[in-house]
Structures are given as C-alpha cells and as structure tokens.
Amino acid sequence: MFKLRVLVLVFFSVFSLGAVFPPMSGTAIEKYIQKKLKHNDKILRINEKNLGDAGLAVLAQSPSVRSVTTLVLYKVHISDEGIRALAESPNLKNLEALYLEHNFITDKGVEIIASSETFSNLKILNLYHNGITDEGAKAIANSDTLTQLIELNLNYNQIKGPGAIELTHSEKLRQLHNIQLAYNPIEKTGKQAWKRFQLMESFKDLHRNNRLNQVGQALIGSFGVMVLLDFPFVSELETLDLRNNDLTDEAVIALSQSEKLKSLVS
C-alpha cells in the first residue's frame, strides 16, 4: 500500500508540475531542427523541449536556420545567456518574428535583444511570461535596432509603470501598433498611458478604413472622449454617436467647447 501511494504521488507530481527532461544533445537538436523545417523552412517552432542556453547556442550556429523568418521558442528553459547566443548568430538575419514565451529572460536579455543588429528586421517580439521589469521595457522603447516592430507582447511580466509609459511614448518605435501588457502590476499612470495608446491605435485603424464616424460604437467612455479630442483627424468627424458611453460632465463640456468638431452634422 505504501509503495502504491508513493507511485501515485510521483505520477501526480510529474503531470501536475511538469517533468523536466535531460537537456537535448547538440546532435539531437540539429536533427530536430532539420525535421521541423522539412515542410516549411521559414518557420521553426520548438515547444516544451529542454533546449537550455547551450542548446540555443547550437541552434544559433546551425546553418539550417538561415531561411527562418519566424522562430518560436516556447518553454525551452532558456535565459539571458541563450539570448546572447541568438544575438551573436550569423544565421538569423532574416528573422521577422521572435516568440520567447514562458522562459527565464530578464532585463539583461532584453537589453541584448534591443541592441543586436540580428534583430533589426523584427516585426513581432513576444516575451510573454518572463522576468522583465520596467528597465527591460525602457530598453525596447529606446532601441535604435527594433525600429521595425509592429507588435510587442509583454504580458505576464513585472512592469509597474515607467516602462509602460516609455513604450507608449517611444519616438524610436514608430511602427509599433500593438502593445500587450496584461497581467503586469502596472500602476495607474502606466495603465492610463497604455489605455491611451490602445485608443489612439483604434482611432487610427478606423480612420485608415474610412470608418471614423463609427468611433462612438466602441463605448470609449469619458477617458476615450478626451483622447479622441487629441486625435489628429478628429476634425474630420461628421457624426458622433456616444449613446451608452456614460460620459462625465467634464467630457460633455470638453465636447461642447471643442473647436475641432465644427464639421459635425449629428
């Protein structure tokens, strides 16, 4: 009975906490890469393998990855040293999307990414669930290398506010339209900066698609109204339906006194 109980506990631990398998050997990694790229040499996905930093160094030096434009490394037990190996790779110059979800990357690793020419063509950077703080976010915001970024995912990290503010006001990341910061301990000013950024991007999207007159349907609220009045193309509005937005007196007064809404018909 005692042995059975021990076996049950071991079984439960392995499947509830996740088994940690031995690191993959260099030969095994190379074979795995070739297998994964056999049908599509542009996308390399490695999920829940014990690659480790040493294994990532093997990947980075493999000629097989020269064609890769999308690299996904999910739960592969890598840290900042692994990121350094990627950054120094002569074979990853074509990377456009880098997914590093659920690993052990800190601000140091982010600083390496933000300063490496290897990542100068990145359009998507996903750092979901790592150990990144405001300093890492600031490194991205001030990067002279990541200027092509369109989408940035920093969900489930440790960003508290200053990093969020710098990201949403970055003068370097002119192409960045999507910033994900959910499940970070962000303080009020940081949350407001992020919300403002999201609203501005939604307004830009409506304007690009000639649907700016539908802006009120998004239930933007009083804060959204104040942001809308700062939108460069707000003067093009012809109709503005803000029913069900539960506006404050401040927002209503701002709307009524705005010189930018002279084109409104209804």
PLM region spans:
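Sec-dependent N-terminal signal peptides
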Residues: R5-F15
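LRR N-terminal entry segment and analogous cap-like coil->beta motifs
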Residues: F21-A87, E101, R208-T239, D246
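Leucine-rich repeat
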Residues: S25-Q34, G52-Q61, S79-E88, D107-S115, ...
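Inter-repeat linker/turn residues at the boundaries of leucine-rich repeats
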Residues: H39, P63-R66, P90-K93, E117-S120, ...
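Conserved hydrophobic beta-strand positions in leucine-rich repeat
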Residues: L44-I46, T69-L73, L95-L100, L122-L127, ...
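Consensus "Asn ladder" position of solenoid repeat domains
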Residues: K49, V76, N103, L127-N130, ...
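A detector of tandem-repeat and repeat-rich interaction/domain scaffolds
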Residues: T70, A85, P90, E96-A97, ...
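A charged, solvent-exposed segment within the mature domains of Sec-exported extracytoplasmic proteins
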Residues: E117-Y183, E187
